[in-house]
Design a protein with these regions (language model features):
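Nucleic-acid substrate recognition interfaces
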Residues: 1-229
Length: 229
């Protein structure tokens, strides 16, 4: 769970993971989306590696996104339009983060290409203008539609849905990790009482109520004795 400041409270994030049950048509769309985000990641990872090896520079996310928009208009890659466009953009953002980390620590090597066998099938998408909803046991996703969901925990009504990561296990089970944002109120304590302390040479201190500490007078007695000597 993460926090950040906003107004008088703290904005916190909380994720819920639910099992989802897509129908056969939705399973096909999920498989297409998993494949497309993996292809996008690998295509521009190769592009970034080649440019880095040529002149030690990086291909920015903005450039990659523009190139992808152009690619989607071609006959060869028009299938990219069949899946959630935000999921493809998120794949490029994840790649950009991975490559930025490589720039900070080049000795770690380039990010690895994603493999269907080695990597878990998943994709992430963002909630924009209410395009994702969770209601009455169904999760509505862009390009996918209403997916049946087993909601074993209730979500407070004031929580705001931010993003969803859909994943498939090797055994074929589907899950949705849903990230919510909410404002956590900070309890302000009212000042009940104020006490001032006045330090002096005659006593250790005197508070604003006129009280003095009842410490033994060893120091003062020794001071008087030294003065007599």
């Amino acid at each position: 769970m993460g926090f950040r400041g906003k107004g008088s409270g703290m904005v916190a994030n909380r994720a819920y993971k639910f099992r989802i049950y897509p129908n056969d048509e939705q399973k096909i769309l999920f498989a297409k989306t998993f494949g497309c985000v993996r292809m996008v990641y690998n295509h521009w990872l190769d592009r970034k590696i080649r440019q880095y090896e040529e002149n030690k520079t990086n291909v920015t996310y903005t450039i990659c996104a523009k190139e992808m928009a152009t690619m989607k208009k071609t006959e060869e890659y028009r299938f990219l339009k069949e899946v959630d466009s935000i999921a493809l953009q998120q794949s490029l953002r994840h790649l950009d983060t991975a490559f930025q980390n490589f720039f900070k620590q080049p000795k770690t090597g380039f990010p690895r290409f994603k493999s269907k066998k080695r990597n878990k099938s998943s994709y992430s998408t963002l909630c924009i203008n209410g395009n994702i909803t969770l209601s009455n046991g169904y999760l509505r996703l862009p390009k996918i539609g209403q997916v049946r969901l087993k909601q074993h925990r209730s979500v407070p009504s004031e929580y705001r849905l931010k993003s969803v990561t859909v994943s498939q296990t090797p055994s074929g089970k589907y899950h949705a990790s849903i990230l919510f944002e909410y404002e956590e109120q900070v309890q302000e304590r009212k000042l009940q009482k104020f006490l001032g302390l006045d330090f002096s040479m005659h006593e250790l201190y005197r508070d604003s109520n006129g009280k003095e500490p009842a410490y033994p007078g060893y120091y003062r007695n020794a001071e008087k004795k030294l003065a007599r000597e």
